[in-house]
Amino acid sequence: MKRIISLLLALALAFSLTACTAPAEKADGGKLQIVTTLFPYYDFARAIVGDRADVTLLLSPGREAHSFEPTPIDAVTISEADVFLYNGGEGEYWVDSMLDAAGENIAVVARMMDYVDALDEEYVEGMQGADGHDHDHEHGSHDDHDDHDHDHEEDEHDSDEVEYDEHIWTSPKNAVVLCRAVCDAICKADPANEDFYRANCDGYCAQIEALDARFAALCESAPHKLLVFADRFPMLYFCREFGLDYRAAFHGCSGDTEPSLATIKYLIDKVEDEDIPVVYTIDFGTKKVAAVVSECTGAAVDTLYSMQTVSRADFDAGETYLTLMERNYEALRKGLNE
């Protein structure tokens, strides 16, 4: 079904491109057009360009990223971009067919998972489906890339069928690398404004690095380092950076929402045995399991933001990667120090 959807979208895009006899003038008078699939890259891009480019978020606020299917309108939006920034991985299986159909229309394409070491999805003790997986496997990473400027050349990705965790931006150290990769792509498309873009990028990265240092100090001094998620677990990169252990109902990209009774019992027992003060859910996650665990254990419930997407209210309020990570800091402070 996924392959059929991709082909249909590609055909729709190809038709829309061949129907145009000449390139249309940009309605905004020539501003650089940047299209991103996910919120973190949208946020990095808008912080870098200010008012000198237009940034479009393909995954509209409030939409669940794991069930996102692009429309023909989305395909045309991608084809009209000067810079296209996407995450990569199985969650964006449809991108390759979009880019094939767009041809050379897009000046710069950047796949964000190429810029950091990708980690395998993990199945830890107690997690739904963990019985069928080896907990001690090696964590793979993508091959290093000397040249990250795709220019829409044909790439080969993930041919070994490894299932990677795609939430790479949840590590602040990764976020700095990704923000700079976004800046590089934008500067390549618009070198006339490079000094402006790089100055903005440096300023934003400095703020992420300052927050990263606060997280490091918090986690280093914490009396315990175990987080319990009664939900999906999209924070693998964050926990790996800061040396935190975790238990969760589902892995990060799971489509499941109803854990088995054995998984629920495991989480309840773990919270009681380890005297865990806070059970976590995630933005756009189910709250039902956390409510059950909380009722049985007395633990509080709080939310950690994976930021793959954001709510309409947060988007309209101008929330950023930094402000949402600040919420995460406060939620973790309660869970690690109480």
Each model region followed by its residue ranges:
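Hydrophobic membrane-targeting signal helices
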Residues: 14-19
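Extracytoplasmic metal-acquisition and chelation regions
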Residues: 7-9, 20-338
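Positively charged n-region of N-terminal signal peptides that target proteins for export
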Residues: 1-11
